[in-house]
Amino acid sequence: MRFSIQPTILFFDSGVGGLSVYKETKQLLPDCHYLYCFDNGFFPYSEKDEKDIIDRTLRICQKINQAYPLDLIVIACNTASTVVLPELRRNFSIPIVGTVPAIKPAAEMSETKHIGLIATKGTIKRTYVNDLIKNYAHHCMVEKIGSTKLVEIAEQKLRGGEVDLNVLKQELSPWQTMKSLDSVVLGCTHFPLIKEEIECCLPQVKFFVSSGKAIAKRVKFLLKGIEVRSKIQKKNLIFCTKPLEDDKSVQQILDFGEFENLVILSE
């Protein structure tokens, strides 16, 4: 799918985990104009108040939209997606795509009908997620782990740090003796970044399922019906809400996403 004029797509997350979704979309649609924003000034979202998450997400997206007219927004954060989508859709007239844990495909893939959901504590406790399980995995035994530590490990890895497998194994230890567990939902956009390490800790699991490819296909479908707002060719940029601690982290993120520059948004 090629565009004569680049649509501008914003990916939004509290951290850099949403880059896993961004990469899937960019691979499918390389000719778009991409912006990525991570709200590291309020990271992580998982245990924050819902109203604060909604207010910050809306304010930041509106600020970016003023400078770079957006054609589509992807909330590349499972926790935020469970609370912010209605408010964003009320305030924007463009398509808004959320991130939903891939519970339905995991339940369909599972041969033993014993599946696991790894997500943030915020995502795990949402009624929305329990409804997904009730609607699409009612015939399965569903295990759940809510972890902030795994999010931090993924952030560290993307910024050039080492992954401590012992810490990872400790977080996943409740599942290590579950021999019938054969499908795991990576219910946070950070977790595909450490998928290989998670696989090492759970060798009995045959299927690790995330939402990235499905979101990319959804973006492609929605772009067919839009009229591009800005006709100017632009570079791909990444935004944050707080300065990063070191230049190495900045360069790692720029290189991973092939961004031209990192811009710090003032609060």
Swiss-Prot record:
Keyword flag Ribosomal protein: no
Q: Name one GO biological process term.
A: cell wall organization
Q: Which Pfam families match?
A: Asp_Glu_race (PF01177)
Q: What class of enzyme is it?
A: isomerase
Among InterPro entries, the record links this protein to: Asp/Glu/hydantoin_racemase (IPR015942), Asp/Glu_race (IPR001920), Asp/Glu_racemase_AS_1 (IPR018187), Asp/Glu_racemase_AS_2 (IPR033134), Glu_race (IPR004391)
What is the E.C. number? 5.1.1.3
The keyword Ion transport is annotated on this UniProt entry: no
Q: Which reaction does it catalyse?
A: L-glutamate = D-glutamate
Give the pathway: Cell wall biogenesis; peptidoglycan biosynthesis
Q: Which UniProt keywords apply?
A: Cell shape, Cell wall biogenesis/degradation, Isomerase, Peptidoglycan synthesis
Residues that hold substrate according to the record: 13-14, 45-46, 78-79, 189-190
Where does the record place the catalytic residues? 77, 188
Tell me where on the tree of life, at the top rank, the source sits. Answer: Bacteria
The Swiss-Prot or TrEMBL record annotates one GO molecular function as: glutamate racemase activity
Concerning its family, UniProt says: Belongs to the aspartate/glutamate racemases family.
Described purpose of this protein according to its UniProt entry: Provides the (R)-glutamate required for cell wall biosynthesis.
NCBIfam families, per the entry: glut_race (TIGR00067)
Q: What is the recorded name of this protein? A: Glutamate racemase
> What species is this protein from?
Histophilus somni (strain 129Pt) (Haemophilus somnus)
Gene name of this polypeptide? murI
